[in-house]
């Protein structure tokens, strides 16, 4: 099965790939050429650091190309799931213990970033939410203990 990814997530990875290819790669090539011009490569720390950075960048480029070529891109705006929670849904939850609300979007594993409210489809939170609807209650076993949440809203925002 191909890993799912939102259209927004694909754009972000493509932007990173383009930046690496068009900006970072040429910078490293220039840094290597400049370090080479300094002479003896055996004891040239600048040269070795630039080569190491080149290796890292080329590895990241290959990784991004592979991820993008295998991803199943899902346009969240075109989903018609109503109030049912599926991949791509943006869900507002109310903690039944504290009445605090939080908002998460269920995204692919490669684009997850909890600080931005993006939870991976494979995470315990997302697994508990999939298939639920507005008004449903879910229980999540968190490191801090068992938490109960009510699904307040389900939206499909691109």
Curated annotation (Swiss-Prot):
Pfam families from the UniProt entry: GreA_GreB (PF01272), GreA_GreB_N (PF03449)
Keywords carried by this UniProt record: Coiled coil, DNA-binding, Transcription, Transcription regulation
Signal peptide as annotated in the record: none
Biological process, per Gene Ontology: DNA-templated transcription elongation; regulation of DNA-templated transcription elongation
Coiled-coil region(s): 45-72
Matching PROSITE patterns: GREAB_1
GO-annotated molecular function: DNA binding; RNA polymerase binding
InterPro entries to which the protein is assigned, alphabetical: GreA/GreB_C_sf (IPR036953), TF_GreA/GreB_CS (IPR018151), Tscrpt_elong_fac_GreA (IPR006359), Tscrpt_elong_fac_GreA/B (IPR028624), Tscrpt_elong_fac_GreA/B_C (IPR001437), Tscrpt_elong_fac_GreA/B_fam (IPR023459), Tscrpt_elong_fac_GreA/B_N (IPR022691), Tscrpt_elong_fac_GreA/B_N_sf (IPR036805)
Function comment: Necessary for efficient RNA polymerase transcription elongation past template-encoded arresting sites. The arresting sites in DNA have the property of trapping a certain fraction of elongating RNA polymerases that pass through, resulting in locked ternary complexes. Cleavage of the nascent transcript by cleavage factors such as GreA or GreB allows the resumption of elongation from the new 3'terminus. GreA releases sequences of 2 to 3 nucleotides.
Similarity annotation: Belongs to the GreA/GreB family.
Name the record gives this protein: Transcription elongation factor GreA
Lineage: Bacteria, Pseudomonadati, Pseudomonadota, Gammaproteobacteria, Lysobacterales
Gene name of this polypeptide: greA
């Amino acid at each position: 099965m191909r890993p799912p990814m939102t259209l927004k997530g694909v754009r972000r990875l493509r932007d990173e790939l383009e930046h690496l290819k068009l900006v970072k790669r040429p910078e490293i090539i220039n840094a290597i050429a400049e370090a080479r011009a300094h002479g003896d490569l055996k004891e040239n720390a600048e040269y070795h650091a630039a080569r190491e950075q080149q290796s890292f960048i080329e590895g990241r480029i290959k990784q991004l190309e592979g991820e993008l070529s295998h991803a199943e891109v899902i346009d969240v705006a075109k989903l018609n799931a109503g109030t049912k929670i599926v991949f791509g849904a943006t869900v507002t939850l109310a903690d039944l213990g504290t009445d605090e609300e939080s908002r998460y979007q269920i995204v692919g594993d490669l684009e997850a970033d909890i600080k931005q409210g993006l939870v991976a489809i494979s995470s315990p939170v997302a697994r508990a939410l999939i298939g639920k609807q507005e008004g449903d209650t879910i229980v999540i076993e968190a490191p801090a203990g068992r938490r109960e949440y009510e699904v307040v809203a389900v939206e499909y925002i691109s």
